[in-house]
């Protein structure tokens, strides 16, 4: 591995993880300091940045008052791990912070994720009693293990 495999920039090969049906495993910190990990649907957007151009922000849609939302409200540090659905040896781990929580567009966003992950036009578990919320994560450190290091392992696995 080389220094290019550790970055703070979501490069195109890393962004591809967010385009498929790859689950993100979101790690947050519980009140007692222990880790809490949740598999979750995950998304990415480009955000306008005033002087540095564009920055990519990771979106996680959850329900208000779920444990992960409570945890990031108290401690915004998160870790996200993803593996490529086509090559589970290719992976990315992202450390970052939740920089914003918003309900704006959260219902529409969960429908968008349902389309990608379930091929459904609408999220099947919509409920008027559950308020959706989007967690916006700014990456601070990224580790990427690209296919050039993992193709051999994948070939061995298919034998």
Show the residue positions of the predicted features.
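A short beta-turn/loop motif at secondary-structure boundaries
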Residues: 32-34, 84-88, 127-129
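Alpha-helix boundary recognition
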Residues: 18-19, 73-74, 114
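Short helix-to-loop capping/linker segments positioned immediately adjacent to catalytic or ligand/cofactor-binding
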Residues: 13, 25-31, 120-126
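Short beta-strand segments
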Residues: 22-64, 72, 78-82, 92-94
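Short, basic/aromatic recognition patches
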Residues: 2-25
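Solvent-exposed residues in well-ordered beta-strands and their adjoining turns
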Residues: 45, 63, 83, 99-101, ...
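Charged, gly/pro-rich active-site loop segments
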Residues: 2-9, 90-159
